[in-house]
Design a protein with these regions (language model features):
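Membrane-proximal basic amphipathic "stem/tether" segments
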Residues: 227-258
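Nucleotide-sugar donor-binding/catalytic module of glycosyltransferases
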Residues: 1-214, 254
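Catalytic core of nucleotide-sugar-dependent glycosyltransferases
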Residues: 197, 202, 210-236
Length: 258
């Protein structure tokens, strides 16, 4: 079973080497890496080209202007030839070198369309320093309406699901990943499995862990995502969504306090 990994880059010279090493060191080798660059102005492409031979024909890249990270992801999905598609951002890392092997085994042993798991948030300049954790759980009907959703960087899905139900709606900006997972899992009820295993180390300060403004915009778009997909949510939904995250952040701050 081939896994297609999509990595979007834009001026990512400070972090992309770590990401490439993380992929290169995986024990599972039936992969392809698709790097979708947004016309970087730094040394990102030079770094990618240095790694090209190391991937022995399994790395392909393009560099052209895009309409943002989700547009880049859509380009990658269009290029993918694997059975399963996953996304690893250019500032993120796999938790260890057996992540893809475990994901492949889970797909092979379970007749499911999608798999997701846990992630840890780490310091931008020290990826061994944990800031907080995101522990997932198994989906059940209407979970999304109660504030649940998978951590998107851990979300691996069969390519045929994208072909059947579509790709990222780039009008949703910072929460297009939420809308896509809502559409796939809650609306179309694709089969899915939660792996109780940490899959990703996600740097703080990235596209979806940044400013308060992005968080506010993201939550507005989440409500629009429900409307687009024909769901009515309770007026208490924002509380259901944000309160557990706030509690989790406080717990993690105490847990990982210096």
């Amino acid at each position: 079973m081939k896994i297609s990994i999509i990595t979007s880059t834009y001026n990512s010279e400070k972090t992309v080497k770590d990401t490439l090493d993380s992929i290169l060191n995986q024990t599972y080798k039936d992969i392809e890496l698709l790097i979708i660059d947004g016309k970087s102005k730094d040394n990102t492409l030079e770094i990618v080209r240095r790694y090209e031979k190391m991937f022995q024909g399994k790395l392909r890249y393009i560099s052209e202007p895009d309409k943002g990270i989700y547009d880049a992801m859509n380009k990658g999905i269009g290029m993918a030839t694997g059975d399963v598609v996953g996304i690893l951002n250019s500032d993120d890392l796999y938790m260890d070198n057996k992540v893809l092997e475990d994901i492949a085994n889970a797909f092979n042993q379970n007749n499911v369309d999608a798999i997701y798991g846990n992630l840890i948030f780490v310091e931008e300049h020290d990826t061994n320093k944990v800031v907080r954790t995101w522990k997932g759980s198994q989906y059940y009907p209407e979970s999304f309406l109660n504030g649940w959703h998978p951590a998107h960087p851990t979300f691996y899905v069969r390519r045929e699901v994208y072909e059947k139900y579509g790709v990222f709606d780039i009008s949703f900006n910072v929460s297009a990943d939420f809308e896509l997972m809502l559409r796939f899992i809650e609306k179309h009820r694709i089969s899915n499995l939660y792996m109780d295993r940490t899959l990703i180390r996600m740097r703080m300060g990235g596209e979806s862990t940044g400013s308060i403004g992005k968080i506010i915009t993201g939550n507005k778009n989440v409500l629009r995502a429900f409307e687009k997909n024909g769901f009515k949510v309770s007026v208490f939904y924002p509380v259901k969504r944000l309160l557990p995250k706030a509690i989790d952040m406080i717990k993690n701050k105490l847990k990982f306090k210096k």
